[in-house]
């Protein structure tokens, strides 16, 4: 089971296309679009891999209440939940459309963020990639490699 935590419908559809291409249309995938649903899922199950956005809303949009504002550290909340459950060895690919990730109130370039999450949070199998909608080749390549591993 692959858990995809992504609130952008276009980006999640592109990720799902890659999952189907690499693993096949029968791949077991759970797609959630907010921190609360990701944490609930992780409370009940442990996926084999996670593809994680960093800027996520705290909860699902409720009828008549508007869309929740994405939190720049929403993905970190998911990582903290994984750490609480001692799942620091779970394969994780951070896929974010921002060039930097705010970690402990400090902006860290995406390319350096995986090392920071290893050193500061104890994750052992974490990668990070910049999602560039203008140049899809690098992030698609990285995502396919992650899915194949």
From Swiss-Prot:
Highest rank taxon of the organism: Bacteria
Domain Response regulatory: 1-134
Biological process according to GO: defense response to virus; phosphorelay signal transduction system
InterPro entries, per the entry: CheY-like_superfamily (IPR011006)
Annotated positions of the 4-aspartylphosphate modification: 53
Disulphide connectivity of cysteines: none
Keyword Protein transport (UniProt): no
Record bears the keyword Phosphoprotein: yes
Post-translational modification, as annotated: Probably phosphorylated by DtcA.
Keyword terms: Antiviral defense, Phosphoprotein, Two-component regulatory system
Entry comment, domain topic: Consists solely of a response regulatory domain.
Function, in words: Possible phosphate scavenger member of the two-component regulatory system Detocs that confers resistance to bacteriophage. When the system (DtcA-DtcB-DtcC) is expressed in a susceptible E.coli (strain MG1655) it confers resistance to bacteriophages T2, T4, T5, T6 and SECphi27. Detocs inhibits T5 infection leading to growth arrest but not complete cell lysis, during SECphi27 infection leads to cell lysis. Overexpression of this protein along with the intact Detocs locus cancels T5 immunity; when the phosphate-receiving Asp-53 is mutated to Ala in this protein, immunity is restored.
Protein name per Swiss-Prot or TrEMBL: Detocs response regulatory protein DtcB
